[in-house]
UniProtKB/Swiss-Prot annotation:
Its EC number is 4.1.2.20. It comes from Shigella boydii serotype 18 (strain CDC 3083-94 / BS512). One of its GO terms (molecular function) is 2-dehydro-3-deoxyglucarate aldolase activity. It catalyses: 5-dehydro-4-deoxy-D-glucarate = 2-hydroxy-3-oxopropanoate + pyruvate; 2-dehydro-3-deoxy-D-glucarate = 2-hydroxy-3-oxopropanoate + pyruvate. The active site is at H51. Keywords: Lyase, Magnesium, Metal-binding. This is 5-keto-4-deoxy-D-glucarate aldolase. The record marks R76 as: Transition state stabilizer. InterPro entries: Aldolase/citrate-lyase_domain, GarL, HpcH-HpaI_aldolase, Pyrv/PenolPyrv_kinase-like_dom, Pyrv_kinase-like_dom_sf.
């Protein structure tokens, strides 16, 4: 069983090596369901702080529930804001998914928010959960180089600036938000539209051109396999909420219809 902090960051190393990482989205915001999810064998799990009802008080027990799991926890922050990111760092997250990044400057801000000076602007606390309350002697030396930053492109401006974003130092992966991207391109609710699919493939290709892996959420198996064929290495193939809803509906239908 691993304890905090986890150095070196194996998830960051796997992404850098372009090793396919299959994951699952978590939106149920409950430590029991998260613990069960952590036993399933996924490479990583996103604990969603943007669209799921999560905050510091719900994230901490979920991180505790994943202690000993082989699945790397990734937090999607609600917004690209340094204070929010600092607080999530202090409770023990090392892998960050930053939503709605549209420019190189926004990508740089995300990176800076996770690094201690002089590399960044992260505020300093000498005793918090991530450094085992001050008992890890080399935490400051190790932390900066063990943070993973995944930036989410989900707008036309983000697509237009994908090269600059992907080239940003400290950005580890380019992640596509297919639903918001579809809406931004005029196809709300239809991420399968050819225009959206073309944009997704373009993002993957440009990320690869800059030596960065790409990722996406794809709960439909055919979509996930297509994105893997296109070169995505960081793919969420479902969500705990979706699996729970589908399984319970199927169970009810088996006996009620």
């Amino acid at each position: 069983m691993e304890s905090l902090p986890v150095f070196p960051n194996k998830f960051k190393a796997a992404l850098a090596a372009k090793q396919v990482q299959i994951g699952c989205w978590s939106a149920l915001s409950n430590p029991i369901s998260t613990e069960v999810l952590g036993l399933a064998g996924f490479d990583w799990l996103v604990l969603d702080g943007e669209h799921a009802p999560n905050d510091i008080s719900t994230f901490i027990p979920q991180l505790m529930a994943l202690k000993g799991s082989a699945s790397a926890p990734v937090v999607r922050v609600p917004t690209n804001e340094p204070v929010i990111i600092k607080r999530l760092l202090d409770i023990g997250f090392y892998n960050f998914l930053i939503p709605f990044v549209e420019t190189k400057e926004e990508a740089e801000q995300a990176v800076a928010s996770t690094r201690y000076p002089p590399e960044g602007i992260r505020g300093v606390s000498v005793s918090h959960r991530a450094n085992m309350f001050g008992t890890v002697a080399d935490y400051f030396a190790q932390s900066n180089k063990n943070i993973t930053i995944l930036v989410q492109i989900e707008s036309q401006q983000g697509v237009d600036n994908v090269d600059a974003i992907a080239a940003t130092e400290g950005v580890d992966c380019i992640f596509v938000g297919p639903s918001d991207l579809a809406a931004a391109l005029g196809h709300l609710g239809n991420a399968s539209h050819p225009d959206v699919q073309k944009a997704i493939q373009h993002i993957f290709n440009r990320a690869s051109a800059h030596g960065k892996p790409s990722g996406i959420l794809a709960p439909v198996e055919a979509d996930a396999r297509r994105y893997l064929e296109w070169g995505a290495t960081f793919v969420a193939v479902g969500s705990d909420l979706g699996v729970f809803r589908s399984a319970t509906q199927k169970l009810a239908d088996t006996f009620k219809k």
